[in-house]
Amino acid sequence: MSTYSFQNFALTLSGPGGSISLGYGSGNDKGGVTFEFNENANTLTTGADGSPMNSLNPGKSGKVTVRLQKTSLTNGLLSAMYNFQRANAANWGNNVLSGIDIVRGDQYACQVVAFTKFPSNTYAIEGGALEWTFDVGVMDPALATGG
């Protein structure tokens, strides 16, 4: 039997201004964390005679979205890190994100990481979530067979 639990997911953002845990225990919203590539790895071209040609795209850029409850103290840590990095261009885009499901073995290694923008923040009847998005220069995934 295979079992999944967000409790087994660890994610760390490290860079100028600190190191912040963004996985289980950081006040995540139900949407959790999403890793997404910007481009397809392949482009299929069909020639005039119908011959197919596959072209491998070497790009590995992507986006990571971390959803935190409005009341998560982690929002304050991310806000401070964002402001610290934005104050000096030498600090911008020098982060690393490391994610792992410690039971199943899935891993994501993300380098050349920058905050995409400060999150939108809605004040309403329900607290909702803040979505922190990060642009990733190089994302290396490895899905495991464990668990």
Question: Model-predicted segments: where are they?
Answer:
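Short acidic DE-rich linear segments
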Residues: 143-147
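Short, acidic/charged, Gly/Pro-enriched secondary-structure junctions
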Residues: 79-108
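Flexible glycine-/small-residue-rich
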Residues: 136
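Short, conserved charged micro-motifs
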Residues: 73-79
